[in-house]
Amino acid sequence: MDEKKLKQEDCYEDNLGQGVLTLTTKRIAFDKTRSRIMDFSKHMGETILDIPLSDVTHTWREGLLMKKACISARITNGEQTYKFGVFNVGGWVDDIQDAIDELD
């Protein structure tokens, strides 16, 4: 199966900062962004998160005012939780879970 981009959005992750969250048919990636205030340009930086969907163990939403799309993923020394501030939290959580279910 070829990898296809399903969703992409500017977001903020609690520990990683500002960036672009991308969901594909095979993985979740987070690319750091750099902004320049003088000309309002935004530049993609390095990919600092690249998680195969098969390593995602749990997806959920949390927050009352500042809602977050959350995932837990297996990493080399255990498990890590990431919390992304995205526009449509429910849509992101559902789409991530649907992409994981499609792997099976």
Sequence positions of predicted segments:
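Short acidic, Gly/Pro-enriched loop/turn segments at secondary-structure junctions
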Residues: 35-40, 55-73
